[in-house]
């Protein structure tokens, strides 16, 4: 029963992430734009935690690991929570501004040489021996999917946009690679 509920939830999340819609009963509803999914991931060893299927992991563009807060930050967290301080979140962008920014990011120039660089990085996770990385062959269960290449290219374009450039350079790709495709390269010992 519990496994069925988890599968149903995962299926619903996949539908939302891939098709930008949700289905309730026999009725389908389109999701508003912009639509994005932010998720947290607990260690798999924790009770009540289940590994995401590969198809679901593959749909996340980035995986950002956030470490514990620094000493002073944690003291501030304590003060804010025990004093009952209200956290005020103020919007900094409107939905239409996010949609417009996404359009501009997609116009950032990506040269064919940078495209090849991106594809080589992802292909090296699939065929490490062809890239003189034989020692990685037994460590990688599944190399990055085509979506890993797409995500790396989009992340590099976004980084160039943030750096106020209309074109991608290799440093942009290197800057975003650790967060944009490593979670899509599954180790052989994944449980």
Locate predicted features:
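P-loop NTPase nucleotide-binding module
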Residues: 9-23
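GHKL-family ATP-binding catalytic core of two-component histidine kinases
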Residues: 6-7, 32, 53, 111
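Conserved ATPase-coupling elements of RecA-like P-loop NTPase cores
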Residues: 7-10, 49
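Conserved small/polar residues in nucleotide/adenosyl-binding loops
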Residues: 1-8, 182-191
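Canonical AAA+ ATPase core
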Residues: 19-93, 99-106, 157-159
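Basic, amphipathic alpha-helical bundle interface domains used for macromolecular binding and assembly
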Residues: 82-184
């Amino acid at each position: 029963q519990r496994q069925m509920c988890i599968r149903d939830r995962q299926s619903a999340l996949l539908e939302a992430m891939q098709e930008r819609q949700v289905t309730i009963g026999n009725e389908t509803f389109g999701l508003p734009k912009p639509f994005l999914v932010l998720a947290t991931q607990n260690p798999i060893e924790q009770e009540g935690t289940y590994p995401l299927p590969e198809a679901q992991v593959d749909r996340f563009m980035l995986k950002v690991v956030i470490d514990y807060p620094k000493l002073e930050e944690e003291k501030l967290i304590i003060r804010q929570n025990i004093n009952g301080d209200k956290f005020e979140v103020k919007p900094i962008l409107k939905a239409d501004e996010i949609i417009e920014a996404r359009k501009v990011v997609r116009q950032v120039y990506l040269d064919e040489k940078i495209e090849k660089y991106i594809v080589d990085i992802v292909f090296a996770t699939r065929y490490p021996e062809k890239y003189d990385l034989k020692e990685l062959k037994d460590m990688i269960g599944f190399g990055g999917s085509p979506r890993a290449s797409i995500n790396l290219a989009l992340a590099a374009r976004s980084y160039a946009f943030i750096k106020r450039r209309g074109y991608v350079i290799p440093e942009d790709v290197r800057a975003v690679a650790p967060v944009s495709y490593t979670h899509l390269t599954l180790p052989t010992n994944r449980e």
